[in-house]
UniProtKB/Swiss-Prot annotation:
Record function comment: Binds specifically to GTP-Rho. May function in a Rho pathway to limit stress fiber formation and/or increase the turnover of F-actin structures in the absence of high levels of RhoA activity.
Organism of this sequence: Bos taurus
Residues in PDZ domain copies: 515-593
Protein name as it appears in the record: Rhophilin-2
Subunit record text: Interacts with GTP-bound RhoA and RhoB. Interacts with both GTP- and GDP-bound RhoA. Interacts with KRT18.
Superkingdom of source: Eukaryota
Classification lineage: Eukaryota, Metazoa, Chordata, Craniata, Vertebrata
Protein's gene: RHPN2
Domain BRO1, chain residue ranges per copy: 111-460
Modified residues (Phosphothreonine): T655
Family as reported in the entry's similarity comment: Belongs to the RHPN family.
One of the GO biological process terms: glomerular filtration
Length: 686
């Protein structure tokens, strides 16, 4: 006899005052960041439409045999390619819109580059999860409508996270919740029929898969992107703000590096291993730049040892940006990295190399070795400043000879002016960088300062006497490093914990439907012993006891006693409950573990518009009928994202039948419709 398991008196998941429900930002707020994200969503749709039209035109060109038709199609293809190029340039403009994310109090600092959040489409979990709960766990799916709707609300809230630690915790909580969902509802032998669609943040190309790994990888990318936006928002005019900036970019690098190492075959350009490696380098370069700004924040005194330190710190920043620019110009990254990003990396490389030469020139020209000063220390610092001294010069002789110091200092000034001019030229070649006023002002001011100092010292025979300035050895007191994400610090409650302990009740294990066992304890003896802990398992069963006669088997798991859910009860609690009935009849429900059948894994197709080469995830292929009926609950609670129009979320009916015998469904409680609802759009509002 089989029954449907009805969890009696389930423990509520709601924790009032414990931040169980989290909200995203108001998608209707017309902030600069929300407008930018709305433009990104609109551009994604335009790019998708243009790519579909181009694909259709290419197919028509292959199929057409009429020469006149082929010429018309070629003309249309040229227009479509032109439109796509313009759309990609618009998307690049959004990716370099650094002014929106910068702190408003910053007046004279070079902007940092944040990453934009990946966009997605709405996903309906309800039908697939309800079917799986009925089929796999043999439980009534209506009991889990609240939990399914909570999961969908949490996903919707993650589309508009706030730009602070609360937003990071929101994304991390959903990422960890996906781990629970994957273990409970995504078996390794089949697909669930839930299609996840995410847009590439750099190209706008959509990627769709029936694979939860795409969802998890995209959420990780957005966590890293959110850290970059937090870093650019910090006030870099204060020491605490700069420290927060360094920390945020190090954490962003850690998340992106974790994504690269964990999800190695992601089907999106922005999450490919090569692109992620470049993005990690960019985050660390910006963290190193903020470290240099922190050194310079108190003001630079015209002191020998301090100038040596600052020169080497600037050389370090220039070095990491030079390496970043080289990485951005390698295939296959070069094709998809925004040109303005690569240009800005080159600009910063020249700018900070120029600063290193300027500070070196200052310490050589403005200082002389005086009696009583630490001669050995200055000699050591100067020797460590260069990998090798210019031919014919020694550190100590240079310190003592004013003329040699002047000549070497002017050589560094010439080199500084050259790098400044190159940085300004590179910035002028990029239309997006020309529109960043603060960048132009900083580059111009630095160039004028070096040019003025050289003009004051220039002599007619400098072209004959000056030698090439040696390269400055890069050195930093604080080497920035990747901070590994710590997901364990975010406390998450499994939405579907009523299904039982995850170690036992998971998608990887197949179970029989619950069987009702009616028996009595003869003279206080149950006829079996118990073992295990949450859930309790039948052990050492007496084949002649009443429980065995009623159908109990050794190894069965006890899931309920007298309609009281026992999946989370300990052995002592279950034994105490059984003993409490004495000689009375006991109704116990048990389930048995079925042998797992091995299934050969197959690859599923990745739908990616316009991607000639794609990284394909391994997932499992079966035919799944399209489910178009979107279902949502009428929640007793406010949704995670409680802005929008008044639309009630309707409950959906499952497509599977309950394996129940003589079980009466309890009356459905009437729920009050929420005055708020999620905005249901194809692209997220931000």
């Amino acid at each position: 006899m089989t029954d449907t398991l009805l969890p009696a008196a389930p423990q509520p998941l709601e924790k009032e005052g414990n931040c169980y429900f989290r909200k995203g930002c108001n998608p209707l707020a017309q902030t600069g960041r929300s407008k930018l994200q709305n433009q990104r969503a609109a551009l994604n749709q335009q790019i998708l439409k243009a790519m579909r039209m181009r694909t259709g035109a290419e197919n028509l060109l292959k199929a057409a045999t009429n020469q006149k038709v082929r010429e018309q199609v070629r003309l249309e293809l040229s227009f479509l390619n032109s439109d796509l190029q313009m759309l990609k340039e618009e998307l690049e403009g959004l990716n370099i819109s650094v002014g929106v994310y910068q702190n408003t109090e910053e007046a004279f600092t070079i902007p940092l580059i944040p990453l934009g959040l990946k966009e997605t489409k709405d996903v309906d979990f309800s039908v697939a999860l309800k079917d799986f709960i009925l089929e796999h766990y043999s439980e009534d799916s209506y009991l889990y409508e609240d939990e399914i709707a909570d999961l969908m609300d949490l996903r919707q809230a993650c589309r508009t996270p706030s730009r602070n630690e609360a937003g990071v915790e929101l994304l991390m909580s959903y990422f960890m919740q996906l781990g629970f969902v994957e273990s409970r509802f995504f078996p390794p032998t089949r697909q669930m029929g839930i299609l996840f669609t995410w847009y590439d943040s750099l190209t706008g190309v959509p990627v769709s898969q029936q694979n939860l790994l795409l969802e998890k990888a995209s959420i990780l990318f957005n966590i890293g992107a959110l850290y970059t936006q937090i870093g650019t928002r910090c006030n870099r005019q204060t020491e605490a703000g700069l420290e927060s900036t360094v920390d945020a970019f190090q954490r962003a690098a850690g998340v992106l590096n974790y994504l690269k190492e964990t999800f190695t075959h992601t089907p999106s350009y922005d999450m490919s291993p090569a692109m992620l490696s470049v993005l990690v380098k960019m985050m660390l370069a910006q963290a190193q730049e903020s470290t240099f700004e922190k050194v310079c924040l108190p003001g630079l005194q015209n002191e020998f040892f301090l100038l040596v330190k600052v020169a080497q710190e600037a050389a370090k920043v220039g070095e990491v940006y030079r390496q970043l620019h080289t990485a951005m110009n390698q295939e296959p990254v070069k094709e998809n990295i925004p040109y303005s990003w690569a240009s800005l990396a080159c600009v910063k490389a020249h700018h900070y190399e120029a600063l290193a030469h300027y500070f070196t020139a200052t310490l050589l020209i403005d200082h002389q070795l005086k009696p009583g000063e630490d001669e050995d220390h200055q000699e050591k610092c100067l020797s460590q400043l260069y990998s090798h001294m210019p031919e014919g010069l020694t550190p100590l002789a240079t310190l003592k000879n004013v003329h040699q110091r002047q000549l070497l200092g002017k050589s560094h000034l010439c080199q500084a002016v050259t790098h400044h001019e190159e940085s300004m030229r590179e910035a002028s070649l990029c239309k997006k960088l020309r529109n960043i006023d603060v960048l132009q002002e900083v580059l111009s001011a630095a160039h004028d300062r070096s040019q003025l100092k050289y003009t004051q010292l220039r002599e007619d025979d400098d072209l004959l006497n000056l030698t090439d300035a040696p390269d400055i050895v890069s050195k930093t007191e604080r080497e920035v490093e990747i901070i590994v994400p710590q997901f364990s610090k975010v406390t998450v409650t499994d939405f579907f914990q009523k299904l039982g302990p995850l170690s036992v009740f998971s998608a990887n294990k197949r179970w029989t439907a619950p069987r009702s066992i009616h028996f009595t304890a003869e003279e206080g003896d149950l006829g079996f012993t118990l073992r295990g802990n949450s859930p309790v398992q039948v052990h050492f069963l007496d084949p002649y006891c009443s429980a065995a006669a009623a159908g109990t088997k050794e190894g069965d798991y006890i899931v309920s006693i007298q309609d009281v859910d026992c999946k989370w009860l300990t052995l002592s609690e279950v034994m105490k409950m059984l003993k409490s009935f004495g000689q009375d009849d006991i109704e116990m429900k048990v389930v048995s573990l079925l042998d797992a059948t091995s299934t050969m894994h197959s690859k599923c197709a990745t739908y990616s518009v316009g991607m000639q080469k794609t990284y394909s995830m391994i997932c499992l292929g079966i035919d799944v009928d399209d489910k178009t009926d979107k279902t949502k609950k009428v929640s007793k609670k406010l949704s995670f994202l409680s802005w929008g129009t008044n639309k009630n979320r309707q409950k959906s009916a499952s497509t599977l039948c309950l394996p129940s015998v003589g079980v009466t469904m309890p009356p459905v409680k009437k729920k009050l419709s929420s005055p708020f609802s999620l905005l249901n759009t194809d692209s997220s509002l931000y």
